[in-house]
Every structure is written in structure tokens, then in C-alpha cells.
């Protein structure tokens, strides 16, 4: 009993430390940018003690960006955890089902074929105004991502929801979306191609309060549902047959989990672009710290995802001269070495 209590205290302490780290990273994120701010100036703007440029920068630009990092980081990380548990595959991530590829195709179709979100008044890049209808590309990106999810899950129902079938179907359909995107870009004008490529970059700078609210609703609903199903995920860790003997409807659990994870990913990607590796780095780091118990790993994954995306966004704005680098590039640079380490560690473990 004492050992269990000490483990509970340890896990609680880890969650508290993660929460404190998120708060500190958020405050640091507010201070970094092309217009650097001191701690006192940032606090004055947050507390409404001053107006002017500082307040407009904080509340009009940096707060929406900060909220997007918090929400999307949590959503992508929890999505990765759900996919890894549901599929029994440590390499699974929000891109496993081709969600990101479908969203990119939808956005490219909107921008290249219909000038969605852009006012096309000629062939000069200066004539493309991304502020005309910023939701056009996002809407089509989400619709194609959702359609891809439903298509894969529908096909997999025919094969009793085998995890291997899900992964292979996701890879195959992702390749189809990538090929279709390539064809679209091949026939695009120079300006349309540039706009489409820029959209695909993971960029928190396009976040607004409206998009943050939509992402918040989707991610909160998905995370709460996942937390309510945590004991079923713990049972699934023992294997599908063992989970069935405990009264868990394994095919239904996998269906709900993959649908939830994919929809959270689709919402985030449709507004912010592709942000990779968050769903791989954070869940695995959390499992090493806290173990496999989903009562702890779900909230810890959400916090660690928010922390990673905050730090990546801060780094992207620190490295960019006058403008922020795409945050998706930063997470990929951090995630690729981690992914290779994971691959080699699994190989070593299997050879023992």
C-alpha cells in the first residue's frame, strides 16, 4: 500500500511539474517575437494596466497564437496516445490514417482550383489576400480529412477492425492523397502553388480567437471522452482477448478511439497546417515517466504536447529573422531524431 501511495505521489508531482512548465513556457512565449517585451511590459499588458501597441500585440497576436499552441499540442499528443494504444503500434501517430495528407489535399484543392481563402486579382503574389475568407481552405481541409477517416474506418469494419489493416489502409490512402496533391500542384499557377505550399506549413500565426474556440471544443470533448475510457485502454494493453474477457467491446473501442483521435487531428490541421511528430514524441516520453496507466498518461500527454508546441513556437520565432519559421519544421527537426532512436531501441529489444 505504501508503494502504491508513493507511486501516486510521484505521478502527481510529475503532472504538477508539467503544468508549471507549461505556465512558464506560455509566459516566455508571450515575451518573444519581432517586438521584444520585458517582463513588466508583458504583465502590464496582460493585466490591462497599459494600452497602446504592447496591449494590441499581446491580445491581438500573441494570445491567439499561445492558445493555439496549448490546444493543438494537447490534441495532437492525446491523439497519438489513443492511436498507439488502439492499434498496438508504438509508431502510430495522428498521420497514421492519412488525416494530414487528406487535409493538405483539401486545402490545395480550395486554394488552387477555387482560390479559396484568397482574392485572386492577377498573377502577382501581392494580389492574393489571405484575409478574404480564411475559413474556405480550412473547411475543405477538414471535410476531406473527415471523409478519409470515415472511408478507412468503414473499410476496416469489413476486416473485423484488425489493427494491421487500419495501418496499411491509412498508408495506402495517404499515398493516394499525396499523389492527388502533387497533380494539383503540377497544374497550379506560380502564385497558387506558392499559396498552397505556404498553407501546408504548420503555422500558429494564422490562429484567431474563433479558430481557437473551435479547436478547444473539439480537443476538450475528445480528451474528456478519452479520460472516461481510460480503464478500457488499460485493459486493452493486456491484449484484445484479455480485454474482451473483462467486458470491453474491443472493435467498438478501437472505432471510437480512432475516430476521436482523427477528428481532433483534422480540426487542428485544418486550421494550422501540418504539425508533425507531436503525437509520437510526447506519448512515448510520458510512458517512460509515468508508465502505461491511461489515468495518468492522458492528462500528462496533453500537458507535454502543449509544452512541446509552446517551446517549438518560441524557438521558431527566436530563430526567424523578422518572421517566424514554420513551427511544423521545428517539431519535425526535434521529432525525427527521437523517431530514429525509438526505431533502434525497438530493434535492440527484439533481438534480445
Residue ranges and their predicted role:
Residues 1-352:
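Alpha-helical transmembrane segments in inner-membrane proteins
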